[in-house]
Swiss-Prot record:
PROSITE patterns: RADICAL_SAM. The lineage of its organism: Bacteria, Bacillati, Cyanobacteriota, Cyanophyceae, Acaryochloridales. This is Biotin synthase. It comes from the Bacteria. The gene is bioB. Its EC number is 2.8.1.6. Keywords: 2Fe-2S, 4Fe-4S, Biotin biosynthesis, Iron, Iron-sulfur, Metal-binding, S-adenosyl-L-methionine, Transferase.
């Protein structure tokens, strides 16, 4: 399948038509994924290097100025803490270390400080890096590029028409301008969406094709995590099946992109998480910004149970041997009261 051949009408039908068999859809998306990425899954870890204290009014975000979510707010972590956590991420087999800082965007002084930290991480730790720090211009992006930053994240989050319903302190064009600034500075782009914020099928399709237009190589698909205190709490749009259809849509429209299962994976995909690895080839470990997530061990198990492999896999996979086979031991605490186990002397 070429990137130019998936029509928008088919994309809309894919999301809305219950007669399109879900497993057949997942299998077809899996064929596209296998063509470009094989069976490898890239692991990313988020480090929320500054939490809260944000002047923006994004309705979905626990860090925004209008949220009453009970989060722990803190200023930028120390340089040594950020670097130490990069070492820890690498030791766990993480492919890319993603630093996220709250706020509208960094000052010139903050940009230089972040560049210094990135330079140390690249020189001392040797891990792929991504930074999400809000709105930026070309000069700021160029400073980060010179420091060795591999990728800049700035999510579109939703379509241009739906953006005013989500946030009023910045525009959709502001976000596009940040992506353009990053690209002009030579940085790889990372940009995706949040599903479940009251958007229509057309909104989702619009985002998928907008990211295709900009040839974004890394696309995180987040599913709204309903955090009490946020204005956009729960639109009751998402089911495991719909989440899978959204992931398949993005794979068909952006066949060569790294499609990442982002926030909300555990709660919205639930028992269908393994199926999501057919359209997607990347996911986060150990949580997101304001919420916890599956541990590295749980993610490794999920990937291996589904028949995939971790990109750049380390010796961590050796730990799976002890849990790869199900065994029922003689511990009475896990037995049904009607079940007895007899042991022969032979």
């Amino acid at each position: 399948m070429s990137e130019e051949t998936f029509p928008q009408a088919s994309a809309l039908t894919l999301l809305s038509d219950p007669n399109i068999d879900l497993l057949s859809l997942v299998a077809a998306a899996g064929e596209v994924r296998m063509t470009y990425f094989g069976r490898q899954v890239m692991l990313h870890r988020i480090n929320d290097i500054q939490n809260g204290l944000c002047p923006e009014d994004c309705g979905y975000c626990a860090q925004s100025k209008i949220s009453d979510a009970p989060i722990k707010k803190y200023p930028l972590k120390s340089e040594e803490d950020i670097i130490q956590e990069a070492y820890e991420a690498k030791a766990k087999g993480v492919y890319r270390y993603c630093m996220v800082s709250s706020g509208r965007g960094p000052t010139a002084e903050r940009t230089e400080h972040l560049a210094h930290i990135i330079r140390r991480i690249k020189n001392e730790v040797g891990i792929q890096t991504c930074l999400s720090a809000g709105l930026m211009d070309h000069e700021q992006a160029a400073v980060l590029k010179e420091a060795g930053l591999d990728r800049l994240n700035h999510n579109l989050n939703t379509s241009e028409s739906h953006t005013p319903d989500i946030v009023t302190t910045h525009t959709f064009q502001d976000r596009i301008n940040t992506l353009k600034a990053a690209r002009s500075a030579g940085l790889d782009l990372c940009s995706g969406m949040i599903a479940g914020m009251g958007e229509t099928d057309q909104d989702i399709v619009d985002i998928a094709y907008q990211l295709h237009e900009y040839q974004v190589p890394s696309i995180p698909i987040n599913f709204l995590i309903p955090i009490s205190g946020n204005p956009i709490y729960d639109c009751n749009q998402l089911t495991p099946q719909r989440c899978l259809r959204i992931l398949c849509l993005f794979r068909f429209v952006n066949p060569k992109a790294e499609i990442r299962i982002g926030g909300g994976r555990e709660g919205h995909l639930r028992s269908l998480q393994a199926l999501a690895l057919y359209p997607a080839n990347s996911l986060f470990v150990e949580g997101y910004l304001a919420t916890r997530g599956h541990s590295v061990d749980q993610v490794y198990q999920l990937i291996h149970d589904a028949g995939f492999e971790v990109a750049g896999e380390t010796s961590l996979t050796g730990d799976l041997s002890a849990t790869s086979q199900f065994q029922l031991d003689d511990n009475p605490n896990i037995l049904n009261p009607q079940t007895t186990i007899s042991f022969s002397n032979s």
